[in-house]
């Protein structure tokens, strides 16, 4: 796997992961929720998970669906666990918490989600990746280079914008006591997508401020409905 192919696989599986997340979160509430840390239609954790699963399965030459199920679930759970730790350490936030689910580890991973990831791993190896690989192999080098560069540039821009959004959220929470009314609705709306995408969002430094922020957002949502 060359770098360009890896970039394409990462982009494709990040997009497919985003589709899974949107479907998983939107269907129960019967409305579209742009689920994901980034603003664009990608969930990088799925991209990383898919690449690691592909690498491990190829390296270990595993073909058994049962072994793929077990190893895929373990690999994906480790990545999810590490991602949650990194988000908490770097941004002081937790985007998900499985503490209310059975067989969870510190609320970072749980058996139910691990089982879903394990199932997706089997689908990836046995069904999805062979099709994706065949399509990419049919592309000429120039097309691959152009698509890969576009994906990388767009992803990097999205990461920068999204990280800036998290930093802005931290600044808003830090200054909640001096939150100016004239800027309130603007700032709330800018963070609305992120808050709605992760209703279990927690902040390790500004939990009370985050609770108030969510209440303000709820009031703004009710206000908009009546206008």
What are these regions (language model features)?
Residues 1-227:
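Aromatic-rich, lipid-facing transmembrane alpha helices and their immediate juxtamembrane interface loops
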């Amino acid at each position: 796997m060359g770098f360009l192919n890896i970039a394409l696989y990462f982009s494709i599986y990040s997009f497919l992961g985003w589709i899974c997340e949107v479907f998983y979160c939107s269907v129960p509430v019967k409305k579209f929720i742009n689920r994901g840390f980034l603003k664009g239609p990608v969930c990088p954790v799925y991209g990383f998970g898919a690449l690691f699963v592909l690498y491990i399965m190829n390296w270990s030459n595993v073909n058994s669906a049962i072994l793929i199920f077990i190893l895929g679930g373990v690999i994906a759970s480790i990545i999810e666990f590490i991602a949650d730790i990194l988000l908490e350490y770097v941004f002081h936030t937790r985007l998900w918490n499985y503490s209310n689910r059975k067989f969870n580890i510190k609320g970072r991973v749980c058996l139910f989600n691990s089982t879903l990831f394990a199932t997706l791993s089997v689908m990836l190896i046995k069904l999805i990746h062979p099709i994706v690989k065949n399509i990419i192999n049919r592309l000429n080098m120039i097309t691959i280079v152009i698509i890969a560069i576009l994906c990388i540039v767009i992803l990097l821009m999205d990461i920068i914008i999204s990280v800036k959004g998290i930093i802005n959220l931290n600044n808003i929470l830090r200054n909640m006591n001096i939150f100016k009314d004239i800027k309130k609705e603007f700032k709330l709306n800018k963070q609305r997508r992120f808050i709605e995408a992760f209703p279990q969002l927690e902040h390790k430094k500004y939990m009370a401020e985050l609770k108030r922020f969510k209440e303000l957002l709820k009031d703004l949502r009710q206000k908009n409905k009546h206008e």
